[in-house]
Amino acid sequence: MNKRFNSEDKIILAIDGLDVSQAKLLLEKCPDIKWVKIGLELFVREGPRVIEILKGLNKKIFLDLKFHDIPNTMRAACFQVSKLGVDIISIHSSAGLKALKESKKASLEGAKSLGVKPPFVVGITVLTSFSLQDFQTDLDRNNSIEENVLRLAKLSFDAGLDGCVCSPWEVKMLRNIYKNNFELITPGIRLNIDSKDDQNRIMTPNEAIDNGASKLVIGRSISKAIDPNKALIEIFKSIESD
């Protein structure tokens, strides 16, 4: 079996829905987890201290707050967030080119002001909770999800962002366009034995990696498993072999 890459760099554990003590316990059970995603629920509940706690455990942090506002507000928010020492932050690509450019610029300025490494800034394209029917009913009846993802990914790339977030269904399409110069972070990952919960456009870890995903965001498949570390190891094995 040939190992294609360091699998620890490919998996981001989503700890949304957990409190700090539960998250720490889960990470103790899964010592090989390198990346952790903090979402809105946990950040609103615990505030920036949760970042300090996880950084104290030597974890890399994807702060997934999905900023979406006018350019000045997004700029100010990204300036402040970048000073927290996180590794990736997310913003909505649909905020527009000016807001995306301002956000990226502010993230560099905020990090520089404290002498910390600037975070990657990634653009959210179309949420994985949308099915095609729901998307066209609620948001855009004239264009497909793929057409919108293409447009929003290009907007992110043109703004100088470091990557985008898309479902595994669109990864191969985007990887063929952007090659290896653009991070493609992929939620909507489920094992064959899992229920899809509130996700619609889903794939297995190995399928998503084979399609060109840079990193996979995985939550319940690990956190809700009877043996979380065993589930993690199985995921590592599935994506490591060629």
Swiss-Prot record:
It catalyses: orotidine 5'-phosphate + H(+) = UMP + CO2. Substrate binds at residues 16, 37, 64-73, 128, 190, 199, 219-220. GO terms for cellular component: cytosol. GO terms for molecular function: orotidine-5'-phosphate decarboxylase activity. Pfam families: OMPdecase. Keywords: Decarboxylase, Lyase, Pyrimidine biosynthesis. The active site is at 66 (proton donor). It comes from the Bacteria. One of its GO terms (biological process) is 'de novo' pyrimidine nucleobase biosynthetic process. InterPro entries: Aldolase_TIM (IPR013785), OMPdecase (IPR014732), OMPdecase_AS (IPR018089), OMPdecase_bac (IPR047596), OMPdeCOase_dom (IPR001754), RibuloseP-bd_barrel (IPR011060). Transmembrane segments: none annotated. Its EC number is 4.1.1.23. Pathway: Pyrimidine metabolism; UMP biosynthesis via de novo pathway; UMP from orotate: step 2/2. SUPFAM superfamilies: Ribulose-phoshate binding barrel. HAMAP family: OMPdecase_type1_B. Homodimer. Belongs to the OMP decarboxylase family. Type 1 subfamily. Catalyzes the decarboxylation of orotidine 5'-monophosphate (OMP) to uridine 5'-monophosphate (UMP). This is Orotidine 5'-phosphate decarboxylase. It comes from Prochlorococcus marinus (strain MIT 9301). The gene is pyrF.
